[in-house]
């Protein structure tokens, strides 16, 4: 099971260079398992025991396994994650031709570690909107090949590089795509038109706009003397998306189960398809009776907010509270913050710990040092919007928000096992 899950995760990461591709990858796997797509613009005719999914903005997705009994009886088991990761996004008018090189201007998306983006083989993917035969259409593209690089400045010209280097995103991050001769001008949108023709065999009249991200072309991989680790891009938080999907499909539960994977978590979640938007609430309102029954159902439900945790790094152990240093390959982490940066409380933490103990899955705890600030997740946002009880958990990770992150190769199986048990649980606290 562990080997198959790890291989599946690596394949999923490769197929999901952007939130758009991640959502499409999740939808493809759901459809293969018998889930039917619901269009938000149509009326829905759902039945008990039915399996459905809905997307918004092509970058967020909710999968619903409607229980055979009414949700009011047993409540709803929800797992939440996010599809986006810090990256470099292409600007609307990006062409830069300097010193005989074609470069693209980029904007930093989210709280990225910037130094690892240098000297990497980069490709480009995302969504392109274009006009064809008088109609406006959108399509996903992925160049796949390494088409760009951000070369470092040689240490001979930057003698203090190893003493602390503050990167200027405006000046230092535009990737190089090509060498150009003389006054030759390159039209980036024409390049996108060519890519649409290559990848989808369609002839766009004009590219109107796009949402494109650079990404590292190096595939995720098992590494270490004993293959103890998985190294790869976007583990935060596609690792949790994939774990939630595998648990949902494995559970085959008679209870009502939901998997929600939102976009825009890394930039605050405040969007139509983010956790701070109405997507989940509107979806549940369409599936559940109104008024009193809706509120009662939510109050009988529980959400597991799954987002990676900070594993204790052997070179930087002092960055953790001495009693709360999550270890890689030692199981999922219950995340606690008394200032509500995480939504965990004693009841939800206790129930998750109970599930782990019943499934013989190791479990850990994390609280940030008292002299450091704490990050957050979709957990508190979803809890405050829905009023649903929530526990924040995640798998320990190194190098979070780097271009290449690291997790334990045993932990995915741990998380899938306990999330499957959660979806199958007959009673919620």
From Swiss-Prot:
EC primary class: hydrolase
Residue positions binding Zn(2+): 82, 156, 401
A single GO molecular function term of this UniProt record: aminopeptidase activity
Pfam families named among the record's database cross-references: Peptidase_M18
Ranges that cross the membrane: none
Enzyme Commission number: 3.4.11.-
Keywords: Aminopeptidase, Hydrolase, Metal-binding, Metalloprotease, Protease, Zinc
Xref: CDD domains: M18_DAP (cd05658)
GO cellular component terms listed in the entry, alphabetical order: cytoplasm
Cofactor dependency: Zn(2+)
InterPro entries membership: M18_aminopeptidase_2, Peptidase_M18, Peptidase_M18_dom2
Gene Ontology process terms (BP): proteolysis
Family: Belongs to the peptidase M18 family.
Protein name: Probable M18 family aminopeptidase 2
Organism: Pseudomonas putida (strain W619)
